[in-house]
Structure formats: C-alpha cells, structure tokens
C-alpha cells in the first residue's frame, strides 16, 4: 500500500488538505489526515496539488514505422512527465492498425513498452486511403478505442457516411481530422496576412469548416457519435455549436497551441511553427476560447506530434506538420490562463480529465475512493523554463522552448505505480 501525505486536492473548486491511501491499483481512502500503518510506502506531496491524471485523446506515438521520431516507450514517458496517465494514439503508423493482425501487433508493442495507459485508435479505412472500410466489429473486439483516419480527412461523403453507420452499430465514435484536400492549395500555414507577408502558400479556414459541416449532417443521418479533432477556426466553432443545438451527437477538442498562439506569433519561415491545422488568426483564437468556455468545444487534447530535428529544420513548405505537446500542455495552460485569472484551476483540470472522459465514456479522470489511482502531483508555485534537453520525448519540435511556466508535474502515478518522479 501507498500513502500520499500532505497533498492538496480540489473540492468544490477549492484546494483542500488531503491524504490519499492507495491499495494496489485503486484509491482506498481520501481524508484530511490518514495515519500511516507499519510498512506502508509514504509519498510526501509537500503541500503540492494532487490532480487526477490527465487524459489525452489525441497523440502520435509514431511506433510502428516511425521510431526515429518517437516510440511508444518515449512517447508515454513524455506523457507521464506531463501528468498524463491515459493517452490515445492515432493510427497514422506503418502499418496502420486497420486489421486484426496489425492491431494485435500494435497492442503487443503497447503491452511491452507503454509507461501509461494507452487506448489505441483503429483507422476508418484500410491504410487510411479512404477507399475501403475496415472491419469495425473485429477491431472493437481487439480493443479499438474509436475509429479515425487522423492525419488525413476522409474525402468522400459516402465513405464517411458508411463508416459512421458501422461505428454506430458498435457504439464507437468516428473521430475526424477535418481537411478537404481540394481546398489545401499546397498550403503550409494559415491563409492570412502572415502568409502573404512571408510569401508562403496558405491553407484557408474553409478547408476545415466545410468538411465539418458535411460530417455533422452525415452523423445526424447515421446516428453516430462524431468527434472533431483539433478545431482551429471560428467557422468550425459556429458549425459545431449549431449542430449541438440541433441535437446532433457531436463533440470536439482544441489544442493548447491553438489556444495560445496565432499566425502573428510566427517569426518567419520557421517550421517549428508548422502544424496541421495551422495557427490561425486572432479572431479564430478568440472563437476557440469562447467555444471552450461555453461548452461548444468539449475538451483539450495535445495532438503531440514529434518529428526529427532535421525534418523540422527545413523550410515550412517542405517540413512535416506538427509539434510536441505532452510535456508542456498543463504548465503552459496553467501559466497563461489560470495564473492570470481567466480560468479557475478546476476548469483547466476538468478540460484535461473529466471532460475527455465524459466525451468518450471513459471511467477515468477523477480522484475517488474505489477509483483507479491515476494521479499527478503538481508544483503550482515554482517557475521553470521549458528546455528541450529536459524532454523525455525523442523530439523537441515546439515553439514554446524558452517559455517560463508554473504548474510542473513532479510525480505521476498510473494504477498505483509511480511512472514519473522528478528527473527520474
């Protein structure tokens, strides 16, 4: 058994003194003071905040096929360092988890290497080519969390509609990277004033919002839970808000980088600022914040997307899309939204715990007696600088290097086992 002493937990929106007794994988007791018994392993929280473990429904672990960028081991170590106890990896690997054989192989890699709980997606279509549906019932039987072709949009309405019908039959969500290929126009960043200034091809807002508009109507017809990945535009927020008001089962996520940065933050032709969807306008960012606060957007997910340094050293036109985010999400959001009074600590924690779990009907995301001992101890008071050399991820492709932040996790526990502690 383990006993966390001298911690603080959120109760009714306020930090309250609490000890947490852990028996095996579950929390046995939460109380203001618990006397330790002989032989118990005591963890001194030293007055720090003890949060439910965070749940990230959108990461890229790259394995199999892209191990030079990230592995399941390094990606989940990075997640633990960031306070995440559950992550859901996208299927844009090689091979794609699009069959029982491929999914079983992926699950074995997870079982052998993961440092946190991993709930893998299966693809919607074979090899994510958008031409042939996978075997939904067989993949659910193997443990598919949900279905997505993330990394690309499903281009034909008929294929998406048929996929939604199959997903509804097995009571799983269709999770969509929304991007109409005919509207990308070879873009490498947001189509706006900054792309014009830099002379870099831009991706217009409608590239995303048009496909969301199509899909919410398909989801309504199919009776399917439809989840929108990394919303980035004001038009997308409007479409999702209207769909929810119409009673369509649509949910959505937003990334930390789209909440924190805009096209105006891009200093030049620097691929560290290249992600998909791209950093949008100030108006778009404001719409995302409004949508998150009013419930149009359900939760925050990182879209952790590691790449090798030489890949991101290329010009924006040639470099791959994506930035890492597992190790920086909470500190950045806490520093920029909670410490300045825009959000409460409870709001931020909910966006990373209860909200994603409610979105996908998961049994995690809370600290409660008889619940899983998934938690992270966070130092809310000490300032640290984000340094790439401190990352446990293989990659450090993020524009947030050098930022000074508060709210750094100092210990993370998954099902009662310590998976990250300080610099270990």
From Swiss-Prot:
GO terms for biological process: 'de novo' UMP biosynthetic process; purine nucleobase catabolic process. One of its GO terms (molecular function) is zinc ion binding. It catalyses: (S)-dihydroorotate + H2O = N-carbamoyl-L-aspartate + H(+). Zn(2+) 1 binds at residues 58, 60, 150, 303. It holds the Pfam family Amidohydro_1. Its cofactor is Zn(2+). Its EC number is 3.5.2.3. Keywords: Hydrolase, Metal-binding, Pyrimidine biosynthesis, Zinc. Binds 2 Zn(2+) ions per subunit. The active site is at residue 303. It is an enzyme of class 3 (hydrolase). The keyword Hydrolase applies. CDD domains: DHOase_IIa. Zn(2+) 2 binds at residues 150, 177, 230. The keyword Hydrolase applies. GO terms for cellular component: cytoplasm. Pathway: Pyrimidine metabolism; UMP biosynthesis via de novo pathway; (S)-dihydroorotate from bicarbonate: step 3/3. Substrate binds at residues 60-62, 92, 276, 307, 321-322. Catalyzes the reversible cyclization of carbamoyl aspartate to dihydroorotate. HAMAP family: PyrC_classI_B. Belongs to the metallo-dependent hydrolases superfamily. DHOase family. Class I DHOase subfamily. This is Dihydroorotase. It comes from Staphylococcus aureus (strain MRSA252).
């Amino acid at each position: 058994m383990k006993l966390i002493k001298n911690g603080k937990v959120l109760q009714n929106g306020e930090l309250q003194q609490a000890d947490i007794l852990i028996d095996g994988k579950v929390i046995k007791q939460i109380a203001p003071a618990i006397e330790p018994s002989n032989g118990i392993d005591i963890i001194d929280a030293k007055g720090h905040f003890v949060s439910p473990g965070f749940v990230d429904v959108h990461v890229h672990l790259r394995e199999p096929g892209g191990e030079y960028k990230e592995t399941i081991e390094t990606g989940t170590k990075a997640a633990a360092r960031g306070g995440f106890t559950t992550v859901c990896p996208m299927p844009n690997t090689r091979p794609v988890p699009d069959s029982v054989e491929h999914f079983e192989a992926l699950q074995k890699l997870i079982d052998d290497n993961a440092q946190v709980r991993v709930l893998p997606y299966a693809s919607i279509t074979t090899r994510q080519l958008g031409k042939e549906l996978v075997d939904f019932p067989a993949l659910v039987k193997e443990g598919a969390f949900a279905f997505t072709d993330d990394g690309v949009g499903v281009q034909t309405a008929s294929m998406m509609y048929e996929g939604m019908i199959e997903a509804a039959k097995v009571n799983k969500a269709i999770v969509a990277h929304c991007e109409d290929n005919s509207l990308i126009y070879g873009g490498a960043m947001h189509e706006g004033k900054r792309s014009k200034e830099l002379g870099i091809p831009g991706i217009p807002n409608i590239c995303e919002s048009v496909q969301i508009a199509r899909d919410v109507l398909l989801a309504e017809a199919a009776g399917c839970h439809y989840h929108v990945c990394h919303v980035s535009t004001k038009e997308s927020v409007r479409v999702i808000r209207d769909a929810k008001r119409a009673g369509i089962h649509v949910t959505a996520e937003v990334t930390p980088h789209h909440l924190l940065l805009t096209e105006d933050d891009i200093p030049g032709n620097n691929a560290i600022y290249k992600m998909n969807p791209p950093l949008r306008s100030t108006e778009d960012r404001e719409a995302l914040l409004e949508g998150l606060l009013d419930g149009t957007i359900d939760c925050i997910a990182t879209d952790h997307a590691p790449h090798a340094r030489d890949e991101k050293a290329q010009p924006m036109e040639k470099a791959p899309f994506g930035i890492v985010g597992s190790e920086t999400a909470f500190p950045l959001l806490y520093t920029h939204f909670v410490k300045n009074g825009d959000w409460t600590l409870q709001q931020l924690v909910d966006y990373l715990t209860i909200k994603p779990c409610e979105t996908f009907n998961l049994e995690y995301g809370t600290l409660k007696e008889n619940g899983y001992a998934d938690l992270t101890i966070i130092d809310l008071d000490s300032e640290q600088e984000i340094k790439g050399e401190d990352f446990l991820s293989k990659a450090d492709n993020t524009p947030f290097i050098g930022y000074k932040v508060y709210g750094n996790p100092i210990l993370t526990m998954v099902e009662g086992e310590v998976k990250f502690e300080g610099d270990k």
